[in-house]
Amino acid sequence: MTQYFDGKLRKATLLLTTVMALTAAGYAGAHEETAGEKTLLAHNADFQKQIVEVAKGVYVAVGYSAANVTLIQGKDGAIIVDTSANPVDAKAIIEAFGSRMVRPVQAIIYTHNHPDHSGGATVFAGNDKPEIISHRLLVTAKPDTGRGKREGGDAFGTSLPDDQFINAGTQLEYGRKTPHTREGFLPPTQTFDGDSKNLTLSGVKMELLHTPGESDENTAVWLPEQKVLLAGDNFLKTFPNIAPLRGLPTRKIDEWIASLDKIIALNAEHLIPGHMQPVSGAANVKAALTAYRDGIKSVWDQTMAGIAKGMTPDELVQTVKLPPELAKNPYLQEYYGSVAFTVRGIYAQQAGWFDGNATHIYPLTEKDRATRLLAMTGGQANMLKSAEKALSSGDLQWAAEQADYVLAVEPHHSEARKIKADALTELGERQDNATARNYYLTAAQYLKKNP
């Protein structure tokens, strides 16, 4: 596997990694870096710009956009797998590919419908009129639900100032510098149904495998002669985002596990994920995929066993953990997805919204509960005094919750908003999960800007 670091010598790697870390660490002068921030800053090394020759005639562009783009050279043209987030990034990737980017582009394959993988197709297609290939479910995929206009951007840190943003978990930036509007998307001209489809494109034999998981339509691309597997977003160098903060349904874990079983059986020698660095060496690929499957399955099995015992979501979050050997695995660090989020998502998906406590069938409204608690504790001033004490002692969650009692009754109470914003800021700074960090910090920013 050959690496070309943005067209420069290998020694540029260290310089680039350092620059990326310093760029993201603009906040360092304001406070001492937390352990979580140090972890996320180190994770930035996984996004450095480079063109990697995975196998003969197979190149992947890492770090030039939110998602990877793979170039497969054929006998009379090229096949592109995923197309980056937008035309701006796509043009930069074509330039980085340089002479390796052969024309015409005979086909473009989408692994799934997410904008960061499908937004630059028009640039790669140019005037070549390639076949655009995907699973049929990509065509019928519904837009993400979300909870409002800000939701996706909040988890990705889209509106955070530079001195607070580090990364978005699977990418160095999402929509901060270049758009994620799918403006360069081209609809499929050819789809397949069922479990798989064998193709020969520009003389390259390949098999498209329907591997639902991160998305229902996720398609793995298997190159049997080169022993190269492109997994889409079913495998990443982070615990998977099974139950996203940004307002999406919990992913179908049983299908995800089955899809990983399917691709493990291929015995690939090279593995290209949808984001970050490829993995090479048959033993390394098998170990990485197996650990990924086992990590997901462990959380699933533990959660389902707990549900069967009548445990509540809060109880499950306290008890369900990755086994020690998996918790240390580099492909299961919680930069993007979270074990705790996954546990709550599985519970809601499999057992519904009700936690089994009869008191929670028809609970008081937040405002009603807060009004009674404030009366019981002597009013808003006493509650805020207690919240300030919690904040100063580092009991950040309790500080934020007490501020919420006041805000439930008086949403624009300036002191309560400040206490909550300060608590959320510190909570965010301590996170090594990028989506949690970004959401905390964005919520704090919103409280400060909208008193």
Q: Where on the chain are the PLM-derived regions?
A:
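Gram-negative bacterial Sec-dependent N-terminal signal peptides
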Residues: M1-A28
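Accessory terminal helices/loops
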Residues: V19, G29-L41, A265-H270, P278-P451
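Metallo-beta-lactamase
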Residues: K38, E53, G77-A78, A85-P87, T140-K309
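Active-site metal-binding motif and surrounding structural segment of the metallo-beta-lactamase
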Residues: D46, I51, K75-G77, P87-S134, ...
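Conserved beta-strand hairpin/beta-sheet module of binuclear metal-dependent hydrolase folds
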Residues: Q48-S99, A220-L223, K227-D233
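Divalent metal-coordination and catalytic microenvironments
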Residues: G57, I72, D82, F97, ...
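Short, solvent-exposed loop/turn and secondary-structure capping segments
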Residues: I72, G120-A121, K142-R147, G232, ...
